[in-house]
Amino acid sequence: MQLAFVLYKYFPYGGLQRDFMRIALECQRRGHAIRVYTPIWEGAVPPGFDVRVAPIKAFHNHRRNEKFSAWLAADLARDPVDRVVGFNKMPGLDVYYAADGCYEDKAQTLRNPLYRLFKRYRHFAEYERAVFAPAAHTEILMISEVQQPLFVKH
């Protein structure tokens, strides 16, 4: 199978990044072809990996994420894969590795209500729903049992 792994930034020392690398290398060892999509790649590329760095720029993270998602969708339409595995919340994933906590829970409980009026909030809430909404049909790999009820609640 051709697998696409998607993450917003790869650098060799992050926890999410180490999890991604471990999983991708194991999939490769089992005979799958590995393609990686990211706007930022720092470090060596493992032999056999097809790393595609998105040529995008934006001042705000949420705008960069939107541009990256559009670029990713266009590239996958031109050159499809069997499964898309994401390590950050975004539309179009077949599988999501839940390394981050529930954004909506943090926005509702830890932020001022005015926070929810801003584009940044709307973006991240929408991307979380794109993964966790029942209509999304995304397979979720939870690494924290504590977070699961929060995702279900929101």
Predicted regions and their residues:
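Membrane-proximal helix-turn-helix segments that form the acceptor-binding/catalytic region
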Residues: R120-I143, Q148-P149
